[in-house]
Amino acid sequence: MDAQTRRRERRAEKQAQWKAANPLLVGVSAKPVNRPILSLNRKPKSRVESALNPIDLTVLAEYHKQIESNLQRIERKNQRTWYSKPGERGITCSGRQKIKGKSIPLI
């Protein structure tokens, strides 16, 4: 007998002793689930009742007012007083381009 078979026999004896001492743990390899169990505290709504009931539009109207007020605030922010408004031709350049010391007006 070589050392490997002797080791296997010793380990088999140890495993048999452990299985005899712990019969409930033999073959159990799964971990217990630690996730919380979710429960519904309220009574679930019936889909038929919710389909037949009209939709409450007051919340939607309030949301629409909120969006409009935000839009007006953004427009006021974009129309600053210190910026000049574009004329009839739109935004035109009034700068000059410098190449080799010459000043050439931008078109």
From Swiss-Prot:
It comes from the Viruses. One of its GO terms (molecular function) is bacterial-type RNA polymerase core enzyme binding. Keywords: DNA-binding, Transcription, Transcription regulation, Transcription termination. Residues 85-107 are annotated as: Disordered. Pfam families: N36 (PF11438). InterPro entries: Antiterm_prot_N_Arg-rich. GO terms for biological process: DNA-templated transcription termination; regulation of DNA-templated transcription elongation; regulation of transcription by RNA polymerase II; transcription antitermination. Interacts with host nusA. Plays a role as a transcriptional antitermination factor that allows the virus to initiate its lytic phase. Activates expression of the delayed viral early genes by modifying host RNA polymerase (RNAP) into a form that is resistant to termination signals. This antitermination function requires the host NusA protein which serves to stabilize the interaction between antitermination protein N and host RNA polymerase. This is Antitermination protein N. It comes from Escherichia phage lambda (Bacteriophage lambda). The lineage of its organism: Viruses, Duplodnaviria, Heunggongvirae, Uroviricota, Caudoviricetes. The gene is N.
